[in-house]
Amino acid sequence: MKRIVTIALLALAVCACSRKPSEMSGNPLFEGWYADPEGIVFGNECWIYPTWSQPYDEQLFMDAFSSKDLVHWTKHEKVISKENISWLRRALWAPSVIERNGTYYLYFGANDMHEKGEGGIGVATADNPAGPFRDALGHPLIDEVINGAQPIDQFVFQDDDGAYYMYYGGWRHCNMVRLGDDLMSIVPFEDGEVYKEITPKGYVEGPFMLKRGGTYYFMWSEGGWTGPDYHVAYAMSDNPFGPFERIGTILESDPEVATGAGHHSVIKGRGKDEYYIIYHRHPLGATDGNDRVTCIERLYFDEDGKILPVKITFEGVPATRL
């Protein structure tokens, strides 16, 4: 009997040792200074397109990263660069990427435009998510300040009816436009308006739209991107045009983890209510505003559909199939 018990205990020990703890992504997700991460799922892979966080004059290309489990990431260098954008001079920022019928569209901000003719929001295309993306127009899609919104930080959102909208804007103003069927032009809304200002209270930059069920969650960044007070707030609406009344902050600094958590995107996993928030932050002790890294956390909702505040971590999220 004693021998049987011993064998059983040994079997349990072997079984316990063979159970590996879930791999975690860790934060940051990958090495290097990267900010403004756009996360999107293509097939069974998550792709992240960030800004290369360096001085403006050095920001002449973008890298991308892909993963099938949110833990192991492959770097794709220079998916877009100055060689394929004739009017790019500096400050290649905040990509937004979509796919339709096998073509990938990458929308970008360039040149930190302050006056008409200096730059603005452009669009590039490729037949592969790793690029190379090439400028599709030869000039900006939006090249002027309208309703006070600097043409940067664009996010393209497809609604359930097939319509594509672009939300964009810096300098504390946010506009919304409708894209044409070619996804490279702007067409008027049904009321004839072309640029709708939808700026919510507190808005600074970095708009993002998520539709969950029948609810539209409009999110944005507040504060200064170089400092510790950068954070993300949100609003809810029953339509993509708003109005968007600020509800509260969902992502912010933690003095024990990192500062300046903001400029995010959201992806959906396989589960019914499985969402992840991808964002940048400053490591503790960082002294340069460009010292920003890309991180990920789970995003949860309460029973009323409101977004619960996100706890930023060093651990990140467990490995998961997409």
What is each model feature region?
Residues 2-8:
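Sec-dependent signal peptide recognition
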Residues 9-10, 288:
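Enrichment for repetitive, rod-forming helical segments
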